[in-house]
Amino acid sequence: MGLFSSINTASTGLTAQRLRLDVIANNIANVETTRTSEGGSYRRQRVIFAPRVVSPYWK
């Protein structure tokens, strides 16, 4: 594993964690929301991560 692929892996992990924290912050901000703009009640959001399979660029 080269330096750039290590940096890319770290960057991907940090981006995923930022998304997770953004969703948590949004859920906390809407904890007392009783009605959405569509008229229904607020439902918490979830982040679901899935593995990303990337083939090497030389193949």
Swiss-Prot record:
It is found in: Bacterial flagellum basal body. Keywords: Bacterial flagellum. Belongs to the flagella basal body rod proteins family. The keyword Cytoplasm does not apply. GO terms for cellular component: bacterial-type flagellum basal body. InterPro entries: Flag_bb_rod_N (IPR001444), Flagellar_basal_body_rod_CS (IPR019776). The basal body constitutes a major portion of the flagellar organelle and consists of four rings (L,P,S, and M) mounted on a central rod. The rod consists of about 26 subunits of FlgG in the distal portion, and FlgB, FlgC and FlgF are thought to build up the proximal portion of the rod with about 6 subunits each. Pfam families: Flg_bb_rod. The keyword ATP-binding does not apply. Its main location: other. This is Flagellar basal-body rod protein FlgC.
